Amino acid sequence: MEVSPLQPVNENMQVNKIKKNEDAKKRLSVERIYQKKTQLEHILLRPDTYIGSVELVTQQMWVYDEDVGINYREVTFVPGLYKIFDEILVNAADNKQRDPKMSCIRVTIDPENNLISIWNNGKGIPVVEHKVEKMYVPALIFGQLLTSSNYDDDEKKVTGGRNGYGAKLCNIFSTKFTVETASREYKKMFKQTWMDNMGRAGEMELKPFNGEDYTCITFQPDLSKFKMQSLDKDIVALMVRRAYDIAGSTKDVKVFLNGNKLPVKGFRSYVDMYLKDKLDETGNSLKVIHEQVNHRWEVCLTMSEKGFQQISFVNSIATSKGGRHVDYVADQIVTKLVDVVKKKNKGGVAVKAHQVKNHMWIFVNALIENPTFDSQTKENMTLQPKSFGSTCQLSEKFIKAAIGCGIVESILNWVKFKAQVQLNKKCSAVKHNRIKGIPKLDDANDAGGRNSTECTLILTEGDSAKTLAVSGLGVVGRDKYGVFPLRGKILNVREASHKQIMENAEINNIIKIVGLQYKKNYEDEDSLKTLRYGKIMIMTDQDQDGSHIKGLLINFIHHNWPSLLRHRFLEEFITPIVKVSKNKQEMAFYSLPEFEEWKSSTPNHKKWKVKYYKGLGTSTSKEAKEYFADMKRHRIQFKYSGPEDDAAISLAFSKKQIDDRKEWLTNFMEDRRQRKLLGLPEDYLYGQTTTYLTYNDFINKELILFSNSDNERSIPSMVDGLKPGQRKVLFTCFKRNDKREVKVAQLAGSVAEMSSYHHGEMSLMMTIINLAQNFVGSNNLNLLQPIGQFGTRLHGGKDSASPRYIFTMLSSLARLLFPPKDDHTLKFLYDDNQRVEPEWYIPIIPMVLINGAEGIGTGWSCKIPNFDVREIVNNIRRLMDGEEPLPMLPSYKNFKGTIEELAPNQYVISGEVAILNSTTIEISELPVRTWTQTYKEQVLEPMLNGTEKTPPLITDYREYHTDTTVKFVVKMTEEKLAEAERVGLHKVFKLQTSLTCNSMVLFDHVGCLKKYDTVLDILRDFFELRLKYYGLRKEWLLGMLGAESAKLNNQARFILEKIDGKIIIENKPKKELIKVLIQRGYDSDPVKAWKEAQQKVPDEEENEESDNEKETEKSDSVTDSGPTFNYLLDMPLWYLTKEKKDELCRLRNEKEQELDTLKRKSPSDLWKEDLATFIEELEAVEAKEKQDEQVGLPGKGGKAKGKKTQMAEVLPSPRGQRVIPRITIEMKAEAEKKNKKKIKNENTEGSPQEDGVELEGLKQRLEKKQKREPGTKTKKQTTLAFKPIKKGKKRNPWSDSESDRSSDESNFDVPPRETEPRRAATKTKFTMDLDSDEDFSDFDEKTDDEDFVPSDASPPKTKTSPKLSNKELKPQKSVVSDLEADDVKGSVPLSSSPPATHFPDETEITNPVPKKNVTVKKTAAKSQSSTSTTGAKKRAAPKGTKRDPALNSGVSQKPDPAKTKNRRKRKPSTSDDSDSNFEKIVSKAVTSKKSKGESDDFHMDFDSAVAPRAKSVRAKKPIKYLEESDEDDLF
């Protein structure tokens, strides 16, 4: 059959029809796809957007079960159902915020009938018609979506409702929802029911009502929407817990559940429901810390063992996921706990904040204004803390309790566990034959194998000792012996941090090599088989540092594996310390006392050759083989003898036994001293028969020598203030007696050679550099001269040049301080049979007080500040005169700040700061040992740039300092400056540091450590010893002069008798001549006989004998021969001439006269002569220092202006108002507290009461001073006057006391030469130095005589002006206000004294000038007030002072000079002390010269600034003065 050609076409048509129908369907589906739903339909369709998931979820939740109570278990529930219940419950709780009278909530849960009811009293919902919506309010808010009373965000509410959904969502997801509310106000009761998911509203019922308001919501959840059949056990348990939540978080509300009142009395009792039956690690109940911070915040804290846990509520909503409110509270606690943990876990595993948080369980109940959440489920509160509407600052009591509640202990236990885990990773649990990664190990061939217990690991001190051991292994073989070199001393693991142990390569290598495992107990023999080595042999030098290394290794094993010590796991290899040989005989000694015993028992010991072995490196390879061949003699085993061994090791290395260690060392020093006195030999360990050693013996007989030598190296002697290294340097310099400078590096080599210095030369070079430094905060008296860059205050001396480039030589003062005449009375030490430095030198003043001391030894540390040279000299003179020494304050050369006493041995050191204007301050001095660069980097930079925690405080700063002076000009906003003033500028800018002197420990003259309670105790001890040694010096000189006098007398008589022919020597035998001389009464050489009596010659012979036997024998024979008359018979023939005869007679007479003069002098007279000579040279040195400072400054004369401009840049501004350092009551109380803790013998002289009195006195003094200033005639004040004249308004920043200086400074025009005359005047003043506090006041006021040192003390200082003492001048320079406060006393008297008297010689002031000064003073006093730290910058000084007595430094009023003493305040000190004080004052006036004398800076600023800008006629004269004083300063 053929196919019709139309058929395909028909088929196509059908296909097209089908396509058209499909397109039509597609068009319909667009409408179906894009649909619009009502709000109600949307909620039902997408419930998870509103109430959370409507699917069953299984998770861990806190629930309440009848039989268990609140517990944390796995529950299966529908979050949406839980949420709609919660919304109604929170609404009920919210009503408490609207009506505080609300008192009851009743919750009914009926699972059988699927019925939930929540009833609350308190103000109900208004039963009134809404005029806009035309329906009653209850129906509106429960039956209409998007209605709420919470939409006004301007109203701050602390309720849970927020978005207008809550109750409506419950209505929508219920099959039946009934609202019943009654309002007494509107006298109606409203009731209405909604059904079918709020789809159908029932009839509204309105009834008259006259009872108490209430609201009741009853609903039946639409379980089908939640895919549930009934309210199961889990969801009910969750709902019940929420009822308990409301009972705990809502105050004063009773909650009933199914008719029963819940037994919850408040948040605290609610928290207990969680912690019931919970125990901590020790089995005790958890401690709960509770605090009701305020009416909106309540916090509880306890320990958590399951990571961080929190139970928190915001406006009664349970925020199960926490939020910002929990973080806000937790972070406060964590911050404090982290600090505590870090302190208790020093060096352990680093602990971070989140790790601390993991041990906390926190409960927070908060009311927060308008809280925000990350979802409608309200589980996580997201509002920023700044918007909370309240703060929660936990009290110190809460924090303290939190620290003690067990959390810290829990964290520390966790830290230990973590540390142990980390340490165990470093150990290998498997024994290996080969070890990789330790290149310097020469492993024993059998190590780690079957015979590993027979292997010994030799640990050597350094690579050179390893070479020696390897040489010796050629004898014993390499199978059983391995060698590993240690790099110096290993860690004290008993006190090391976890990090140190983890990172310490030496310890990790030893563990790896030996195969040790932390926490493994090696009690039994089998456990030792797990080790790669069965023994460790320690091979170190036979010196004290070698002993220390042995001790540290013993400590390392004992601390981690004490059981190993019982197996004789440790042993040592000893080598000789001395070998003696004669012909082919050889003897070895292993301790010096044994060698000394041999010497004393061997008559001819001098004929033996002696070789000292300083370390293992001294031995040759041949000797190494000899040592190992005689292993029995050289191997000493450590034997465990019982608990006393454990106690001894712990004593030596435990941080907790510091006091026991002190007693241990004290007993040792006393025992050693007694043995010396009784002539007994020293104890020693290694005799010829020693084969083993107990740990107790090792610690108490060998290691103690290291501990003692550590103290000797670190703590100076009271006698000369030097440590052994410094003493060796001084000994070498005295011996070399260089007249020319020498390179530091070369001098270090010379010291090592001449004094047997056995340590690194680098430390020796640093010692030399430190002895020569003279910047502020270093030495008050440098014994060596710094010729080159020896460091400055910019970097605290760290900026010194390389020792190869700098030179030094003895200071001209050194031999005046350490007179050569005393050398014969000293006891010199011997090292390797070479005479080296003495046990101590005996200076004429206690150098330990002049230059201070600092050091940390074993059991003790020492810290003593510097004191003023002239004060000490004056006090020594007082002691010689039988008077009591005056109290002294620390003093640092050229320091211009103030030092005040807070309590006995407690001082506060203040820098200098002045206010230039409302936005600028000037810092012109930093506290002692606060270095300029460090201050800039650590204080000003963070203030300028801010940090993560603190915003910037200043806007800019400029630097104008030199290497000797400080000047920062700091800019800040007016508000910030005002706030800083209120807090205290010194405090804000960290310009105050404390100085505590409770550790004044020094070696006394017999070599025992002694703790001094006060500085005057040191002075008295030194005085008694020095006076005794002046007696010994006198005895020695009398003997020497007597012998020399007898020798000259014999020589003169011999020449005269020869001339007269009474003696004939020609052609006679020597023996006959000697007989004749003896018959005629001539003495055998008196000088030689006297020297031999002094045992000087034998000592020298003994030195030579050991080196050269023949010389020894020869010298012996000489000594043994009879009387010697060579001193007569060897005289040249020309002594018989008349000239020589007359000269000899003259010399004889002079020597006799010298002897008679010495006999008439007492030891005190000799001392006074030395002091006078020293002071004279000191003034010359200081004058030279001033001249050196002046070098390089702009020219004089016509160029003075330029010079002033330059100086003005580095000197303090004359316009500034000095800020008086504030000494607060808290500072004094803290100082007293420290004193009670640290000082056993308490000294109450500096009690706070006295300080307080002084503060009051200071205020009064300031007031008086300012009142008197206008008419005062004080020399210094006059200078101020010039300044004020210039400006008219302001006074020198250094008001009153400084003004005194200013007057001096005003003489800047005076050429430098004139400065010297002033100095002469100053000399007299220097006497007063002792009272640094009152220097100024004392000088000016004669009424305050008691305050300052008697004038007799001043004699040495010839340079000070009669009225101004050094210190007085210094204080002025540094701080006017300080001076004012302190010196106000003095300054008032100063003003009363005629200005001309002081200035005429120093400043060359004409009569009219003083008058001007007086007037200026008046204006100055008013205009240039010194600002107390708190006072306003621009107020008149008197007001500021009156207002803030606390800010004053505490100087007592003029009327109370004695009190001032007690309060004791150190004003700025100048390097030149009294001599230069006057000059410095002048120089301070000159700003440009500030660099010369730092102490002058402040004063100089005033004057200098004033002079250049003088505007008034008077000002011109002052300008001239300023220039002159400037030059003086330069001196």
Curated annotation (Swiss-Prot):
Residues 1406-1431 have a biased composition (Low complexity). The keyword Cytoplasm applies. Residues 1256-1272, 1491-1502 have a biased composition (Basic and acidic residues). Expressed in the tonsil, spleen, lymph node, thymus, skin, pancreas, testis, colon, kidney, liver, brain and lung. Also found in high-grade lymphomas, squamous cell lung tumors and seminomas. Keywords: Acetylation, ATP-binding, Biological rhythms, Cytoplasm, DNA-binding, Isomerase, Isopeptide bond, Magnesium, Metal-binding, Nucleotide-binding, Nucleus, Phosphoprotein, Topoisomerase, Ubl conjugation. Its cofactor is Mg(2+); Mn(2+); Ca(2+). Pfam families: DNA_gyraseB, DNA_topoisoIV, DTHCT, HATPase_c, Toprim, TOPRIM_C. It catalyses: ATP-dependent breakage, passage and rejoining of double-stranded DNA. Mg(2+) 1 binds at E461, D541. Residues 455-572 form the Toprim domain. The modification Phosphothreonine is found at T282, T1205, T1244, T1327, T1343, T1470. The N-terminus has several structural domains; the ATPase domain (about residues 1-265), the transducer domain (about 266-428) and the toprim domain (455-572). Comparing different structures shows ATP hydrolysis induces domain shifts in the N-terminus that are probably part of the mechanism of DNA cleavage and rejoining. Belongs to the type II topoisomerase family. This is DNA topoisomerase 2-alpha. It comes from Homo sapiens. The gene is TOP2A.
